[in-house]
């Protein structure tokens, strides 16, 4: 009997392939066309997206990408490739592919790469620690569309999320302790998660609870008093209410109250990207300092640290 050959698919959101208005427009069009991301009726959404949002946002967002672009490409792509390569180095007999929900490399190209390696079984690890319909759900949907076009369908193991996994919490705690050792222990550790519309949560998305689960476990691992840790939500888009409290408004409030030293961690981001390196490390830093705060440090994402790769090994081990 032939032994089953397993491959691993690391999935993330995606990124423009260049910091130009044209590339950003292509990326945003694909991203904002996904009903999992924006579920506004199409007759209302298409004219707004194509006639207003893409023409206005693409040049502005391209400038933001230019401020963080790395020699090897966008930070998300650079760190995601490093994660893929580091995991593959630890698993020499297991093919590891990288696929993005939007942009390149696509999820379909990742599936094709693994099937070309003659795998019988694919372990799908969406690198979103906290489940949301708009992220993990989008990977699930696209995977279904891809496999619906295949004659040969492999076995699939799909890891829904890992918000309170011990190896994940340990990796976050180690990263926070290293930052405390470098900058001193902050007056407040602010945990900023990507927001979603409040309506999604009201309709059953358990993302807010999964964020609370991560926060609870991390606070316990660090041994910090609860009053020294705050949980907020960032990157809201559009006019409808999103999860609160908002990160930028909270930092402004803390600065105005005279909070001296803030450190910000974004536990929901597996790799640094525009939302962490520009929005949190730069924009929100300015908000806090201009409001009267004294010291601000951003704690980097786990990226390709050994502890993060250890976590990926642990999560995928039962299915390999």
From Swiss-Prot:
Keywords: Cytoplasm, Heme biosynthesis, Iron, Lyase, Metal-binding, Porphyrin biosynthesis. Its EC number is 4.98.1.1. InterPro entries: Ferrochelatase, Ferrochelatase_AS, Ferrochelatase_C, Ferrochelatase_N. It catalyses: heme b + 2 H(+) = protoporphyrin IX + Fe(2+). Its main location: cytoplasm. It is an enzyme of class 4 (lyase). Pathway: Porphyrin-containing compound metabolism; protoheme biosynthesis; protoheme from protoporphyrin-IX: step 1/1. Fe cation binds at residues 194, 275. PANTHER family: FERROCHELATASE, FERROCHELATASE, MITOCHONDRIAL. Belongs to the ferrochelatase family. This is Ferrochelatase. It comes from Salmonella newport (strain SL254). The gene is hemH.
């Amino acid at each position: 009997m032939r032994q089953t050959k397993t491959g691993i698919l690391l999935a993330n959101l995606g990124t423009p392939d260049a910091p130009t208005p044209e590339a950003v427009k292509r990326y945003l069009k694909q991203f904002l066309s996904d009903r999992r991301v924006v579920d506004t009726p199409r007759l209302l959404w298409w004219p707004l997206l194509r006639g207003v949002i893409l023409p206005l946002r693409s040049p502005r967002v391209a400038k933001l990408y230019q401020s963080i672009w790395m020699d090897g490409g966008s930070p998300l792509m650079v760190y995601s490739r490093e994660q893929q390569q580091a995991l593959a180095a630890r698993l020499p007999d297991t093919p590891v592919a990288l696929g993005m929900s939007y942009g390149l490399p696509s999820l379909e190209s990742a599936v094709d790469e693994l099937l070309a390696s003659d795998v019988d079984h694919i372990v799908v690890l969406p690198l979103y620690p906290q489940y949301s319909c708009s992220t993990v759900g989008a990977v699930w949907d696209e995977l279904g569309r891809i496999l619906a076009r295949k004659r040969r369908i492999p076995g699939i193991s799909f890891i829904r999320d890992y918000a309170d996994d011990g190896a994940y919490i340990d990796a976050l705690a180690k990263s926070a302790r290293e930052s405390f050792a470098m900058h001193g222990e902050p007056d407040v550790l602010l945990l900023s998660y990507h927001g979603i519309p409040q309506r999604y949560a009201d309709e059953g998305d358990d993302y807010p609870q999964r964020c609370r689960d991560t926060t609870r476990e991390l606070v316990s691992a660090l041994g910090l008093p609860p009053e020294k840790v705050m949980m907020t939500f960032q990157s809201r888009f559009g006019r409808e209410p999103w999860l609160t409290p908002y990160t930028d408004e909270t930092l402004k409030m803390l600065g105005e109250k005279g909070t001296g030293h803030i450190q910000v961690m974004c536990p929901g981001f597996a790799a640094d990207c525009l939302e962490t390196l520009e929005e949190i490390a730069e924009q929100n830093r300015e908000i806090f300092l201009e409001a009267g705060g004294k010291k601000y440090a951003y704690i980097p994402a786990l990226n390709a640290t050994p502890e993060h790769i250890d976590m990926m090994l642990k999560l995928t081990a039962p299915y390999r």
